[in-house]
């Protein structure tokens, strides 16, 4: 509740700043939620806390403000209809998962940690309207690595930054993946379910964002009519 109320408050002041706060925090929370869902989190029941979780190092990095993440779903030819997603996840000869394809309209696409929904299974029954969704898997992709010499090795290519009417303080990017190393989250074919784990929470956050923007508009109207 505190998280959503603070989202509302920040949206009232500046929606781009709110996006950085709520979206990047949500990526850290999603890492924890995904780890719990797949069974890679252990709990210290006696003290009522988490003992360990799969992505603890990444979560700590985000919490320190040293990195942030994003959710890569939309593609040039597929958005709301996720069954049409074509970005592909496959294993190489050594069992390493790799992502190949394109994603567009990605909020904070310049971030370090990317949750990528990609196709790992082909449709077996074309007459099944849900066949395309069952072939999706969730991956965590590191967009770049920082090198000891201060340089940076980039794995995910930023093709362009979108031009927008607003939200100028928040980056929206088009991305390309060319055999980029990835970590599978959960099991193959569970990508749609994992996506809902993140997006259902995000929908509530967007609602609070809308409340904040409405409050801002009402206050601006009050000032305009009294001056």
Describe the predicted segments one by one:
Residues 146-159, 164, 171-202, 220-227:
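A glycine-rich, basic-preceded beta-loop-alpha segment at the flavin cofactor/substrate interface
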Residues 25-30, 38, 77-81, 105-108, ...:
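Flexible loop/turn segments at secondary-structure boundaries
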Residues 96, 100-153:
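A short core secondary-structure module
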Residues 87-90:
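A structural signal for short hydrophobic beta-strand segments in well-ordered beta-sheet cores
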Residues 1-13, 22, 50-51, 81-82, ...:
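Alpha-helical interface subdomain recognition
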Residues 1-56, 60, 64, 106-109:
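Internal helix-loop-helix
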Residues 77-80, 105-107, 129-130, 164-171:
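Short Gly/Pro-enriched turn/cap motifs at secondary-structure boundaries
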Residues 65-73:
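A short, Trp-centered hydrophobic/proline-enriched beta-strand micro-motif
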